[in-house]
């Protein structure tokens, strides 16, 4: 298959910590991997600041977080995408029980949605992680369960409290791993059939690291994390049953001279598990690492200019042939070809031009 669906969330409301809002909201494109042509199929501006999206495996449903700084509580909205007439239809929305809603993840069995709230407190609900059921029609149930993280880290500006930044699920399913930037921890939870979240384990990263996004090796043995605050990338061994993690390796995600003015963002693993890609805001690059399959250790192979500014989010096509970089402050999603043998990226010069892209997801 050479054609895929590309879902894009773009900023459409100003926020004090973002540099402008020039986007529509939620957009859907058809991408031809042979011609590199992207054709817009649908869009809606009815969802506020969809800074993160998850898309069902068949591309029929999309779940969008709304990150609005003035709200004491965020929302997550469900949309249905109909391929036949290329339309987006609103399904429903649910409160996120926390503020600055940062991330979400569809469980591997498709039955639940997990949401992470960065959280600023400020008098509203203050839950860090929330679980929802996904109904047969794709709509979301009311929240099934939630948990709150507590604590702080050594960085007084960014780690004054817990800040859950992302959530994923182990390859075998049933265990969620949450990256909390504020407390330098990865926290694992058992996901109950009824949506309950029971804490299993906590893993502490180096002080001031600021874990943001994580990615799993395809075979589930390793977990990798981009640390936003100290511009490093870490690899850990993972027990998918117990949720236990053990630190293997930490490497700089940018050259030494760039670390002071850089904030790591997203992370992707190639389909064959041999390469890791991490985005650097400030250095405006995509770091390329090879992964030792026996040990999980990382080796830096390259730094590729991101084709714009502020690469907030990355996504690989299902074939692994191309990587998309959502360059927030350049109003474009740059498209790179990828060498499967070396892992290296080449800017194709092609892009999806769209205002303040925050998240890009690609599915068949």
Regions found by a protein language model. Give the residues of each.
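Blade-loop segments of beta-propeller domains
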Residues: 39-110
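Short, solvent-exposed loop/turn segments at conserved positions within beta-propeller repeat blades
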Residues: 16-24, 68-75, 121-127, 179-183, ...
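Short loop/turn segments immediately following beta-strands, especially the blade-tip
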Residues: 29-36, 78-86, 131-141, 189-196, ...
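Loop-centered beta-sheet repeat module
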Residues: 173-230
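A short beta-strand motif characteristic of beta-propeller blades
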Residues: 39-45, 89-95, 151-158, 198-204, ...
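Beta-rich, blade/repeat-based domains predominating
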Residues: 48-57, 97-108, 120-121, 150-172, ...
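Blade-level signature of beta-propeller repeat domains, shared across WD40, Kelch, NHL, RCC1
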Residues: 329-337, 346-364
């Amino acid at each position: 298959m050479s054609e895929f669906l590309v879902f894009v969330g773009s900023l459409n409301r100003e926020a004090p910590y973002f540099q402008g809002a020039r986007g529509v909201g939620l957009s859907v494109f058809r991408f031809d991997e042979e011609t590199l042509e992207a054709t817009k199929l649908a869009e809606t501006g009815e969802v506020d600041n969809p800074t993160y999206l998850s898309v069902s495996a068949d591309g029929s449903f999309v779940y969008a977080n709304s990150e609005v700084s003035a709200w004491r509580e965020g929302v997550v909205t469900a949309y249905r995408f109909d391929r036949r007439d290329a339309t987006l239809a609103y399904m429903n929305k649910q409160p996120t029980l926390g503020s600055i809603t940062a991330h979400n993840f569809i469980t591997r069995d498709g039955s639940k949605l997990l949401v992470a709230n960065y959280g600023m407190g400020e008098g509203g609900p203050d839950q860090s992680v929330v679980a929802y059921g996904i109904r047969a029609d794709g709509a979301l149930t009311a929240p099934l369960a939630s948990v709150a993280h507590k604590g702080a880290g050594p960085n007084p500006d960014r780690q004054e409290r817990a800040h859950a930044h992302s959530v994923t699920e182990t390859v075998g399913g049933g265990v969620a791993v949450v990256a909390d930037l504020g407390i330098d921890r990865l926290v694992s939870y058992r996901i109950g059939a009824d949506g309950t979240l029971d804490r299993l384990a906590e893993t502490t990263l180096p002080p001031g690291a600021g874990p943001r996004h994580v990615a799993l090796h395809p075979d589930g043995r390793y977990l990798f994390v981009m640390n936003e605050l100290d511009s490093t990338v870490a690899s850990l061994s993972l027990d998918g049953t117990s949720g236990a993690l053990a630190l293997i390796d930490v490497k700089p995600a940018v050259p030494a001279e760039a670390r002071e003015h850089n904030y790591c963002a997203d992370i992707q693993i190639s389909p064959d598990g041999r390469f890791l890609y991490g985005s650097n805001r400030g250095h405006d690059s995509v770091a390329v690492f090879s992964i030792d399959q026996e040990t999980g250790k990382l080796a830096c192979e390259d730094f590729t200019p991101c084709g714009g500014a502020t690469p907030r989010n990355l996504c690989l096509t299902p074939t692994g042939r191309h990587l998309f970089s959502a360059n927030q402050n350049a109003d474009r999603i740059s498209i790179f070809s990828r060498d499967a043998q070396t892992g290296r990226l080449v800017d194709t010069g092609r892009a999806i031009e769209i205002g303040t892209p925050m998240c890009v997801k690609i599915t068949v």
